[in-house]
Amino acid sequence: MTAPSAPSSISVCEAWARDGIQGWPETLTTGDKLRVITAAAASGVGEIDAASFVPASVVPQFADAEQVLAGIDESVRIRVLTVNVRGAVRVVEAHRSVRRIDRCGIPFSASEPHNLANLRRAHAAHKEQVAAMVDTLGEADIDPLIGVATAWGCPIQGRVEPDTVFGLVDWAYGRGVRSIMFGDTTGMADPRGVTQLFTAAVAQWPDVDFIAHFHDNRGVGIANTLAAIGAGVRIVDASLGGVGGEPSAVDQGDVGESGNVVTEDLVAALQQMDVATGIDLAALLHAGRLAEHVLGRPLHSRIQRSGPVRRTEIH
């Protein structure tokens, strides 16, 4: 197996405040969310995934989405998520009246059974919604990001064929979308499959910003992220302490413990590989400790416990 090549720089999107805490059992205060977001932004992360614009009756954690955005410095690049046209309209209103929103994620599961379970829509019906959302966001100069979930499979359907994923990419590209995420929603990917899918996608659509988003159910999240980087991806998602993962609302059977790639551990690995992220690791570790304090428990960062490798230790 050939080792992936390392680029000179990578942009890391910090997902703690959105994908990280969406399923957290306690609703956090706006102030606590902003404390962690502010610390993460101060470390130099390239983008913050800050909130979901979904009904509070569905996800109470994001009832304060506008208030959270209002508390984030304008210099910080912001991503949010929504799932329908009504939410897209709300995103546009926040963009115009609260603060700039740079990207808005729109989930679209490559597995149709997963899309039905997660969003209650078959592919054909979801395409109608997504097309309207893309138009609504684009008219407001917000970059629509199609998040192709279950890109490597899901427990309901099993394997998802690459042609299905590429069919969604081609459809989105035809709608003018130039930001596309491949998500390993239930931790079924492996580095070889990641390399194959992203290599083909980057070659076929070279003007698309492809984004890698891995859940770490089976402990290969960082390996998969590095494989994506080696295949040409230059934007990757991670979450402080590895918080987050697959929403519990999806009925998909027992898939074990979920979680995102740990931002601190990923950035430490990239730093050791001399890949620039623009992130100050010490400041990021501080943000991770603050996230632990806010959530009231130890999280999953190994670098927080063992410390980063010092160059003098390498022989």
Which positions does each model-derived feature cover?
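Catalytic cores and adjacent flexible loops of soluble metabolic enzymes
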Residues: 1-315
